Curated annotation (Swiss-Prot):
Signal peptide: none
PROSITE patterns, A to Z: RRM
Alphabetized SMART domains for the sequence: RRM
Keyword Transcription: yes
Modification(s) after translation: Hyperphosphorylated. Ubiquitinated.
Record field: compositional bias (Polar residues): 405-414
Disruption phenotype: TARDBP depletion leads to atrophy of spinal motor neurons. Affects motor axon, neuromuscular junction and skeletal muscle.
Organism, as annotated: Mus musculus
Biased composition regions of type Gly residues, renumbered to the chain: 275-301, 393-402
Name of the protein this chain belongs to: TAR DNA-binding protein 43
Length: 414
C-alpha cells in the first residue's frame, strides 16, 4: 500500500507530498519529476539532529528503518550543479547591482559662456537619451561658470561620450566622470596621455597611426599654435597607464609619455623674502629697513636710507593690518623726527655723512643699521629708528623699530 511522504528543496520551504510505491519505496524519477536535477533525499535525525541520507539503489529510494513517518525530506543536488546554480545567482545579483551603478553624472569641462542647458541637451541627445543636463552658473551674476553635468539613460551611451572630445558651440570640451566618483583608495585613471617633445612635422594622423599599435585610439589633439606637445586618448585606461613614463621613438624623435590629468598639488606656503634687513623686494635699494648685512630695521646710512616693506621682524611676524598701522605711525612720526634732527644738526659737529650730510658718523651710536651712527652728540632723548649691535650706546636715535642681531630688541623705541 502506497503512502505520501513530504519532500522539500529546503528545510524552511513548504514541503510537497509525493507518493511511494506499493512496497514502500520511492522512485528517484518520482522525485526528479517535482525537483529536476535531484539525485537523492536526506532528512534530519530526531535523536542526533544530524542530517542523514536516504539509501538509494539503482534509482530506488528505500525508507529508513522506522519507515518514512512524518519527517520532512530534503532534496539533494549534485555539487557541480549546485555550484553552477550558486554562481549563476551570484552573477545575476552582480549584474543587477552593476546595472544600478553604471550610469552616473558626467562633468562637461570647457563649455563656452554662451552655452545654455538646452544647447547642451540638444548636442548630447545625438548620442542617446539624456536624463539630465545642467550648466553651473554663478549665483550672483547668473553667468555660466564654464562647466556642466549630463546623465544618460544607457551605460553604453555614457562610455561612447566619454571616449571622445566634443565640439560644442565652436569650442572643444571634455566629458568625464567627476573626481568625486573615484574611490578614495583607488587612484585616478585617465585614458588620456601627454606626448611631450613633439616636432612640427608630426601630424595627428601620424600620431594616431603610431599609437594604434598599443590600443584603440579615440582622439588625437595637437594644440595650435604649436607648443611641442600633443594629447592622445585611448579607449582603455589600462593602455594609457601602461605607456605613462615611457620614452618612444616617433619619426626618429624621442617623445616622452606622461599622464595628461592635472596634478593635484597641495597649497604651498610661500616665504616672503622682503623682510627688515633682508632681501630685495621693498622700497629702496635692498628691500629692507637698513642694510642687508646688519639685520637692523632703521634708516640705514650704509645703503642710502633704504626702506623696505618686509614681513618679518626676526621671528616676529607682521600681518597686513599691523603693517598698515606701522606705516600710519611712521608718517605721524616724521615731523617729530625732523625737529629732533634739526636740533642735532645745531648741536652736533659737522661731517660727511652720506645719509644726512651735516651729521658725523661715530661707530658706537645707532640711528640706522650695522655699527654706524647718526648723531655725534650725546644730547637729546634716545628716540627713533633702528637697532643694531651697538644700539644701546645712549646717544642719538637708538632703540627702534626692528630687531637687532645682538640685542634681539624690537618695537618702537622711545
Amino acid at each position: 500500500m502506497s503512502e505520501y511522504i513530504r519532500v522539500t528543496e529546503d528545510e524552511n520551504d513548504e514541503p510537497i507530498e509525493i507518493p511511494s510505491e506499493d512496497d514502500g519505496t520511492v522512485l528517484l524519477s518520482t522525485v526528479t519529476a517535482q525537483f529536476p536535477g535531484a539525485c537523492g533525499l536526506r532528512y534530519r535525525n530526531p535523536v542526533s539532529q544530524c542530517m542523514r541520507g536516504v539509501r538509494l539503489v539503482e534509482g530506488i529510494l528505500h525508507a529508513p528503518d522506522a519507515g518514512w513517518g512524518n519527517l520532512v525530506y530534503v532534496v539533494n543536488y549534485p555539487k557541480d550543479n549546485k555550484r553552477k546554480m550558486d554562481e549563476t545567482d551570484a552573477s545575476s545579483a552582480v549584474k543587477v547591482k552593476r546595472a544600478v551603478q553604471k550610469t552616473s553624472d558626467l562633468i562637461v569641462l570647457g563649455l563656452p559662456w554662451k552655452t545654455t542647458e538646452q544647447d547642451l541637451k540638444d548636442y548630447f541627445s545625438t548620442f542617446g537619451e539624456v536624463l539630465m543636463v545642467q550648466v553651473k552658473k554663478d549665483l550672483k551674476t547668473g553667468h555660466s561658470k564654464g562647466f556642466g553635468f549630463v546623465r544618460f539613460t544607457e551605460y553604453e551611451t555614457q562610455v561612447k561620450v566619454m571616449s571622445q572630445r566634443h565640439m560644442i558651440d565652436g569650442r572643444w570640451c571634455d566629458c568625464k566622470l567627476p573626481n568625486s566618483k573615484q574611490s578614495p583608495d583607488e587612484p585616478l585613471r585617465s585614458r588620456k596621455v601627454f606626448v611631450g617633445r613633439c616636432t612640427e612635422d608630426m601630424t595627428a594622423e601620424e600620431l594616431q597611426q603610431f599609437f594604434c599599435q598599443y590600443g584603440e585610439v579615440v582622439d588625437v589633439f595637437i594644440p595650435k599654435p604649436f607648443r611641442a606637445f600633443a594629447f592622445v586618448t585611448f579607449a582603455d585606461d589600462k593602455v594609457a597607464q601602461s605607456l605613462c613614463g615611457e620614452d618612444l621613438i616617433i619619426k626618429g624623435i624621442s617623445v616622452h609619455i606622461s599622464n595628461a590629468e592635472p596634478k593635484h598639488n597641495s597649497n604651498r606656503q610661500l616665504e616672503r623674502s622682503g623682510r627688515f634687513g633682508g632681501n630685495p623686494g621693498g622700497f629702496g635699494n635692498q628691500g629692507g629697513f637698513g642694510n642687508s648685512r646688519g639685520g637692523g630695521a632703521g634708516l640705514g646710512n650704509n645703503q642710502g636710507g633704504n626702506m623696505g616693506g618686509g614681513m618679518n621682524f626676526g621671528a616676529f611676524s607682521i600681518n597686513p593690518a599691523m603693517m598698515a598701522a606701522a606705516q600710519a605711525a611712521l608718517q605721524s612720526s616724521w615731523g617729530m623726527m625732523g625737529m629732533l634732527a634739526s636740533q642735532q644738526n645745531q648741536s652736533g659737529p659737522s661731517g660727511n655723512n652720506q645719509s644726512q650730510g651735516s651729521m658725523q658718523r661715530e661707530p658706537n651710536q645707532a640711528f640706522g643699521s650695522g655699527n654706524n651712527s647718526y648723531s655725534g652728540s650725546n644730547s637729546g632723548a634716545p628716540l627713533g629708528w633702528g637697532s643694531a649691535s651697538n644700539a644701546g650706546s645712549g646717544s642719538g636715535f637708538n632703540g627702534g623699530f626692528g630687531s637687532s642681531m645682538d640685542s634681539k630688541s624690537s618695537g618702537w623705541g622711545m
